[in-house]
Design a protein with these regions (language model features):
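Amphipathic alpha-helical interface elements
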Residues: 1-47, 51-62, 66, 74-152
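Histidine-centered active-site/metal-ligand motif
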Residues: 69
Length: 152
């Protein structure tokens, strides 16, 4: 178990450093968690794995804190292979742009682009259909109008 715990700690440190750089923060994973908590529900809907990612981040941070601060934990079964795999996977997701915040950013950009394209299409449709003009007055109506002008 000692090797697994040490491997986990090293991978967690890599993830923490990446989160610090990614979020321009001194807090790393803790800041990522805080920003997830501050993210509005309307944005969370873009990420199918939002709740799982949030819970897993909190869990791996807890595991790391146990290993770092509790006496005798390095020789016990605190961390699992799944914990190690998840930390590595989340690191890779940040690197390849599929972490929750990047997914939200991409989805909102696509939404904005779609809205812009729809607006342009609407404007093009309006431009293709000229405004309906008033029907030209009949000869009789023009004659009556001219007579009225003559007497007024």
């Amino acid at each position: 178990m000692l090797t697994l715990n040490l491997d986990f700690q090293e991978e967690y440190k890599r993830l923490d450093r990446l989160c610090k750089d990614y979020l321009s923060s001194a807090e790393g994973v803790s800041e990522y968690i805080r920003q997830m908590e501050a993210t509005p529900w309307s944005n969370r809907r873009y990420v199918l794995t939002w709740e799982d990612d949030y819970k897993q981040l909190k869990h791996v941070r807890w595991v790391r804190n146990q290993l770092a601060h509790e006496v005798g934990t390095l020789n016990s079964d605190i961390c699992t292979e799944d914990d190690l795999d998840w930390v590595q996977s989340f690191y890779n997701r940040i690197m390849n742009g599929s972490d929750p915040f990047t997914v939200i950013r991409k989805a909102k950009a696509e939404e904005a682009l779609r809205a812009k394209q729809q607006e342009q299409a609407r404007k093009a449709t309006v431009a293709d259909h000229p405004k309906q003009t008033q029907p030209k007055p009949s000869l009789w109506d023009r004659l009556i109008a001219n007579i009225k002008k003559f007497f007024s």
